[in-house]
């Protein structure tokens, strides 16, 4: 593998933490006392010895901050524990979710940029526990790194690397060219990270282009896997999961079928990502969620259109071996990484420029989604406490009531019956 740090490491004991720097609120109950205490420690060097740079950075910070920007920054700075602001200077809000905010910060001593995710400890309990459980245990060059953690009774502050190169598809749109070989380079990095995770018994469960970020703006930047809020780590020999979660267009059939599943769901998502990388379109796409899920359950996709004539048969074979309804027949991460399309890319992958078609399709999809989001926001009650962005985030996730509705559909019930027969022939997935 091309990553120096990609060697699998043994899973630590349950009570071990690879990230040892965890600050918990102790006897300094009074906020003023805490601020005074940490004022004298703000110039200490980092306890964990150094950092790097990733979490989503979808906004460019302006060189000159006006009064309005300063007011915004102050608003979020005031919400942070004094221990955090004593060590890190809050620069800009770069993301938000239902129970979290992500800010760009700068280490006061080293001037190194980082991202801090502030999570509501009560409302976001399930998410932050899953994310911390995984990130404290992983060390890989294609996976975003956790640097340190601050905890209070009501908030958790996760200091993480900052990826400044933007999202995968934004880079493709901005780039002047994109070939199969470029797609292969991206997928090799992603699969190297996924192999590492699966080797530790970790399923990401929300792989999608928005969670694949470039480390820096340079053309030679690596890809980083981010957002482990839905991830799951096996605690024993039973490597099955049952939670219904994910993003609709990327969710695997076995999750929709409410069957127990394994890390193989990540390979389905990689198949979807690959299809989009090579065409700029979704393999499974419908504004109606029930219809979308029906299509996914059947793995009903095609290579229609002139554009696909320029795509190699090996690339299509790679997609065909990941978008398989039966997870036992689906390629594992290791087999996908060693697939001929990826393994022989330097010699055989097409150099035909796919950029025009892909970028046009991606831009069209972005425009459609933006209009859809505006429509969704306009129909929401003004009494909602959530921001427009969090409404958008909730809408992008699979909702339990949608799956309930799906299972009432007679056509789907027939499809699920055939899936049950597949599952009955396999007692264990090949992972």
Set out the residue ranges of the language-model regions.
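Intrinsically disordered, low-complexity regulatory segments that flank or precede the catalytic domain
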Residues: 1-85, 412, 416-431
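Protein kinase glycine-rich loop
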Residues: 90-98, 102
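Glycine-rich ATP phosphate-binding loop
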Residues: 101-121
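A short, aromatic-enriched beta-strand patch in the conserved N-lobe beta-sheet
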Residues: 148-149
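Conserved short submotifs of the Hanks-type protein kinase catalytic core
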Residues: 154-167, 171
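Activation segment signature within eukaryotic-like protein kinase domains
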Residues: 186-187
């Amino acid at each position: 593998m091309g990553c120096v740090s990609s060697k699998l490491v043994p899973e630590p004991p349950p009570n071990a933490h690879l990230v040892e720097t965890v600050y918990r609120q102790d006897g300094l109950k009074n906020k003023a006392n805490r601020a005074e205490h940490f004022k004298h420690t703000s110039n200490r060097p980092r306890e964990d010895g150094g950092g790097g740079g990733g979490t989503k950075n979808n906004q460019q910070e302006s060189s000159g901050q006006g009064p309005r920007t300063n007011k915004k920054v102050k608003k979020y700075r005031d919400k942070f524990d004094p221990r955090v602001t004593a060590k890190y200077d809050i620069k800009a809000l770069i993301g938000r979710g239902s129970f979290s905010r992500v800010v760009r910060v700068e280490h006061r001593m080293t001037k190194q940029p980082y991202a801090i995710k502030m999570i509501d400890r009560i409302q976001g309990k399930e998410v932050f526990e899953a994310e911390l459980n995984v990130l404290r245990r992983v060390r890989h060059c294609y996976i975003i790194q956790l640097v340190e953690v601050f905890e209070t009774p009501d908030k958790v502050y996760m200091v993480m690397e900052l990826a400044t190169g933007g999202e995968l598809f934004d880079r493709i749109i901005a780039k002047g060219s994109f070939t199969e070989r470029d797609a292969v380079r991206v997928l090799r990095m992603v699969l190297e990270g996924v192999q590492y995770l699966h080797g530790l018994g970790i399923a990401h469960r929300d792989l999608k282009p928005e969670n694949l970020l470039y480390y820096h703006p340079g053309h030679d930047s690596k890809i980083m896997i981010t957002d482990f809020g839905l991830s799951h780590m096996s605690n024993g020999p039973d490597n099955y999961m049952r939670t219904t979660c994910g993003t609709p267009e990327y969710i695997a059939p076995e999750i929709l079928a409410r069957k127990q599943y394994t890390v193989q769901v990540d390979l389905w998502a990689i198949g979807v990502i690959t299809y989009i990388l090579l065409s700029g379109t979704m393999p499974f796409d419908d504004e109606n969620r029930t219809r979308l899920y029906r299509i996914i359950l059947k793995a009903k996709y095609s290579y229609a259109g002139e554009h696909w004539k320029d795509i190699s048969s090996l690339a299509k074979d790679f997609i065909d071996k990941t978008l398989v309804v039966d997870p036992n027949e689906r390629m594992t991460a290791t087999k996908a990484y060693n697939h001929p399309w990826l393994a022989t890319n330097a010699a055989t992958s097409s150099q035909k420029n796919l950029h025009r078609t892909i970028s046009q399709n991606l831009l069209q999809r972005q425009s459609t989604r933006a209009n859809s989001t505006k429509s969704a926001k306009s129909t929401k009650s003004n009494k909602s406490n959530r921001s427009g962005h969090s409404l958008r985030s909730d809408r992008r996730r699979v909702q339990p009531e949608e799956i309930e509705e799906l299972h009432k559909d007679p056509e789907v019930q027939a499809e699920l019956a055939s899936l049950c027969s597949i599952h009955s022939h396999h007692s264990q997935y090949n992972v």
